[in-house]
Swiss-Prot record:
Pfam families hit by this protein: tRNA_Me_trans, tRNA_Me_trans_C, tRNA_Me_trans_M
EC number from the UniProt entry: 2.8.1.13
HAMAP family linked: tRNA_thiouridyl_MnmA
Protein known as: tRNA-specific 2-thiouridylase MnmA
Compartments where found: Cytoplasm
Protein's job: Catalyzes the 2-thiolation of uridine at the wobble position (U34) of tRNA, leading to the formation of s(2)U34.
Residues reported to bind ATP: L6, M7, S8, G9, G10, V11, D12, S13, L32, G116
UniProt-annotated site: Interaction with tRNA, residues: H117, Q325
Record-linked InterPro entries: MnmA-like, MnmA-like_C, MnmA-like_central, MnmA-like_central_sf, Rossmann-like_a/b/a_fold
Lineage of producing organism: Bacteria, Pseudomonadati, Campylobacterota, Epsilonproteobacteria, Campylobacterales
Entry's family note: Belongs to the MnmA/TRMU family.
């Protein structure tokens, strides 16, 4: 059986190459060139080539920079301009890695596509679903909620049942040269961000632009340094005159360059509206676990699907729910689907 492995040049995907080869798969390594950080590409492509040579597998580079810019990068920038908090990985996965990446794999005659994601594939009532990784501290199933079924049916996640701490140790024991691979210093999980997302936005717009902070009643109570610096739930980086209690961002008004802040109690919401990306009608009316951001604790919610929107009525309040983030539904450890949050109140 032939499998296309999306390689990043790091230890995890390199170890995947070893695992798949040792399991008898014919492996073709593919590096996706997604952004314009050429120094980063040079380092990681060289790493991939070294791994491929060591394991005697084919390797190639797929240049998707133009498609990535249109579908992921530009959406990232425009979302912040609109006062939203985008989730670029959740956009990239269905369109780039498991969209155009899978398309390339099929063109190469591959039966499957594999990645180093920490997630699993589980079969439920004859349907394959994305499921949480055994190592829940590294679980990435949240970012994979929008994958089409035709992609899920062809995915292999070699690391899904393993622990991160064991992987690195075992990988370096089996493939000692992995310890000599170059790395690229970065401080963000977002591949095209070097230091802060603000640095990206500054390339496209005036970000540092002092504005008014208002309370829930509309009264001006302070100042901020520019609305794009803030996300819902943030409690630092703005001033509130004469107040010593914590205030949190509860709304962003791009048109007037204003933010609205309130106490934690005022931040509480219990209903969410999301643009449906992948939740089947079969789950309409049920009560499921939902996550509203990557590291959030799952909450129970009653689900109502109407047209192209998902309405989630939370059974307990949530805090810091931002437009642009993903609403992801789970049943036990399996992902059912989800959408992009458009409203929370």
């Amino acid at each position: 059986m032939k499998v296309a492995l999306l390689m990043s040049g790091g230890v995890d995907s390199s170890y995947c190459a070893h695992l798949l080869s040792s399991q008898g798969y014919e492996v073709i390594g593919i590096y996706l060139k997604l952004h314009d950080k050429n120094k980063k590409h040079d380092i990681y492509i060289a790493n991939c080539e070294q791994v491929a040579a060591h394991l005697h597998i084919d390797f190639q580079v797929l240049d998707l920079r133009e498609e990535f810019k249109k579908s992921v990068y530009d959406t990232f920038v425009s979302s912040y301009k609109e006062g939203k908090t985008p989730n670029p990985c959740a956009i990239c996965n269905p369109l780039m890695k498991f969209g155009l990446g899978l398309q390339k794999a099929l063109e190469l005659g591959c039966d499957y596509i594999a990645t180093g994601h920490y997630a699993q594939i589980k079969e439920v009532n004859g349907i394959k679903r994305i499921a949480k990784a055994v190592d829940e501290s590294k679980d990435q199933s949240y970012f994979l909620y929008a994958l089409p079924q035709e992609a899920i049916d062809r995915i292999i996640f070699p690391l899904g049942a393993l622990l991160k701490e064991d992987i690195k140790k075992t990988a370096l024991e089996l493939l000692p040269f992995l310890g000599t691979l170059q790395t690229y210093k970065e401080s963000q999980e977002i591949c095209f961000v070097e230091q802060s997302y603000i640095d990206i936005l500054k390339l496209h717009d005036k970000v540092d632009n002092e504005g008014v902070v208002r309370n829930s009643n509309g009264k001006a109570i302070g100042t901020h340094k520019g609305y794009m610096h803030y996300t819902i739930g943030k409690r630092k980086g703005f001033s509130v005159f004469g107040s010593h209690e914590p205030h949190y961002v509860k709304a962003i008004n791009p048109q007037n360059n204003e933010i609205v802040v309130g106490t934690k109690e005022e931040l509480a919401i219990d209903s969410i509206k999301a643009l449906n990306k992948s939740l089947p009608q079969a789950f309409n009316g049920g009560i499921y676990d939902v996550k509203v951001r990557y590291r959030s604790t799952p909450l129970k919610a009653q689900i109502d699907i109407q047209g192209e929107f998902i309405y989630a009525k939370l059974l307990e309040s949530a805090y810091g729910v931002a437009q642009g983030q993903a609403l992801v539904l789970y049943q036990e450890d399996c992902v059912l689907g989800g959408g992009v949050i458009t409203q929370a109140q």
